[in-house]
């Protein structure tokens, strides 16, 4: 694996690649990240991972300074899945001066759900992703970038940004990797205490229960009313189990709008996703499930 730190070094390393496949990360890698790398290896002619903890997507009270940096373990993990290039820029490599120009994420898509609890988060994500795309794909006729469905809203925002800027990059969605009890793998799971970890799979179980109950519906006209009741019930159950719930919300997969069409009619089945964010102790977890 070739490790590079500057954009110039990266472009030199990619000089013979016509279609790179890229997986951006913030490090502290787990099996979910590695599954995205394996997926990427089937797409392009060169597999690239990045490790960069992006200051712009952290709010002042969040965990930028304490976010786990596990460099050697990450390098070993990337070697194990035969990653070709690791791009590990230092902050001054991506932000050589204060970042006065930023990508403003589409507010229709980015201001809801995560965006309502983490204002500015998606602007920070889009800004660094566009910088990374420019570093990896400059001069390339085509490329691939793999993002996990676990960060579902982020995936949709990146898809929209890539389309808006007409970038020659296919955004590929990777399935969420889960632990034995269903908990979505996340770098922040390490913040959970042993007792909290035993309780953490309840978030996924509520989403799974909701999706299974949905299968009993007969006719699209029930969808809108059912969703409201299901969201309320899942929130209540999680609260009873000691969670502090930010949201449990059923949305259309395509645009994360409520499950009704422009005329106010319920939309067809099999095109929905339920998204949730909740805090257990001091650890905020997110998850989602398509159905």
Where are the regions that the model predicts?
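Nucleotidyltransferase catalytic core that binds NTPs
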Residues: 2-243, 251, 282, 289
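Phosphate/ribose-recognition catalytic cores of enzymes acting on nucleotide-derived substrates
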Residues: 232-291
């Amino acid at each position: 694996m070739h490790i590079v730190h500057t954009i110039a070094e990266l472009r030199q390393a990619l000089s013979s690649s016509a279609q790179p496949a890229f997986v951006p990360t913030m490090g502290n890698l787990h099996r979910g990240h590695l599954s995205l790398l394996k997926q990427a290896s089937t797409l392009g002619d060169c597999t690239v991972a990045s490790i960069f903890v992006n200051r712009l997507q952290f709010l002042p009270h969040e965990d930028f300074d304490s976010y786990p940096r596990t460099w050697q373990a990450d390098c070993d993990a990337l070697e194990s899945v035969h990653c070709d290039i690791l791009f590990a820029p230092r902050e001054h490599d991506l932000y050589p001066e204060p970042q006065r120009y930023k990508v403003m994420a589409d507010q229709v898509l980015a201001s809801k759900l995560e965006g309502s609890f983490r204002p500015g988060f998606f602007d920070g994500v889009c800004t660094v992703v566009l910088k990374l795309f420019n570093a990896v794909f400059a001069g390339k006729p085509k490329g691939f970038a793999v993002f996990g469905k676990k960060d579902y809203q982020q995936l949709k925002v990146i898809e929209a940004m890539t389309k808006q800027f007409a970038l020659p990059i296919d955004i590929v969605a990777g399935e969420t990797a889960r632990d034995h009890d269903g908990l979505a793998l996340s770098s922040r799971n390490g913040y959970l205490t042993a007792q909290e970890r035993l309780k953490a799979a309840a978030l996924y179980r509520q989403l799974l229960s909701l999706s299974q109950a949905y299968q009993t519906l007969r006719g699209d006209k029930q969808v809108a009313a059912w969703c409201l009741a299901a969201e309320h019930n899942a929130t209540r159950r999680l609260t009873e189990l000691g969670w502090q719930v930010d949201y449990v919300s059923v949305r259309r997969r395509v645009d994360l709008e409520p499950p009704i069409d422009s005329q106010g009619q319920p939309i067809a089945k099999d095109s929905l996703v339920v998204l949730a964010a909740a805090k257990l102790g001091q650890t905020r977890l997110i998850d989602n499930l398509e159905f």
